[in-house]
């Protein structure tokens, strides 16, 4: 908990224990979907597992705007994109000139440098307790 809400700054993108925001996947109940090794690898090598709905996408619009974020919902007529600011924008699919889906995670890959082994172990263990 200390790492999540402290120097790990995980709460800035993830929701857990009723706190944080949802720029990244909700971590509550992750133990029912994955084991602790998945959690550790996701912290240290975030590009290895990109959860569906959290892939970074860049949209070039016909009106010249560029939007970057995560596609939250999509139909043949519209796209709902979640911007890094937390804003959700709904646009007409016909207004998209070009779309680029990133092959990497939006999660920083710097945790191998900013967290020590104990921090990662404590963080992963705490995440696995979340209901």
Where are these regions (language model features)?
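A general structural signal marking secondary-structure boundaries and capping sites
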Residues: 17, 47, 130-131
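Gly/Gly-Pro-rich "capping" loops immediately C-terminal to redox-active cysteine motifs
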Residues: 19-44, 50, 56-101, 106
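Long, low-complexity intrinsically disordered regions
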Residues: 110-131
